[in-house]
Curated annotation (Swiss-Prot):
Keywords: Host-virus interaction, Inhibition of host innate immune response by virus, Suppressor of RNA silencing, Viral immunoevasion. Belongs to the geminiviridae protein AC4/C4 family. It comes from Mungbean yellow mosaic virus (strain Vigna) (MYMV). Pathogenicity determinant. May act as a suppressor of RNA-mediated gene silencing, also known as post-transcriptional gene silencing (PTGS), a mechanism of plant viral defense that limits the accumulation of viral RNAs. InterPro entries: Gemini_C4. It holds the Pfam family Gemini_C4. One of its GO terms (biological process) is symbiont-mediated suppression of host innate immune response. The keyword Transferase does not apply. This is Protein AC4. The keyword DNA-binding does not apply. It comes from the Viruses.
Length: 99
C-alpha cells in the first residue's frame, strides 16, 4: 500500500486483568511531504524497571511517498526509545495521551 493512499492507526488500552478495553482508531490520507508525529507508549514489565515508567517513542518525520507503509513502520520501530516517569504516581487516574 502506498503512503499517499492511506494511513490507519489502531491503539488499545486495558487496565490490569479487567476485561474492559478502550479502543480507538483513526484513518487519514496524507499529502506528499506532509509532516507528522508518531507517539507510542507501552508499559514495561516489572523486571525491566526500577520505578513506574512508560516507554515512550516519539518520532517527528516527513513521510516519503515513495516508501511503502511497511518500510516506513520498520524505520520508525528501529528508532531509539527513551524512558519517562509515569505521571500516575501522583494521580492514579491519569492516562497519557497518544496525541
Amino acid at each position: 500500500m502506498k503512503m499517499e493512499n492511506l494511513i490507519s492507526m489502531f491503539c488499545f488500552s486495558s487496565k490490569g486483568s479487567s476485561k474492559r478495553r478502550t479502543k480507538g482508531s483513526s484513518t487519514w490520507f496524507p499529502q506528499p511531504d506532509q509532516h507528522i508525529t508518531i507517539r507510542t507508549f507501552r508499559r514495561l514489565k516489572a523486571h525491566q524497571m526500577l520505578s513506574h515508567t512508560w516507554t515512550k517513542t516519539e518520532t517527528s518525520l516527513t513521510m516519503e511517498v515513495s516508501k511503502s507503509m511497511a518500510d516506513q513502520l520498520e524505520e520508525v520501530n528501529s528508532l531509539p526509545t527513551t524512558l519517562m516517569p509515569r505521571h500516575s504516581i501522583v494521580d492514579p487516574s491519569y492516562r497519557p495521551s497518544i496525541y
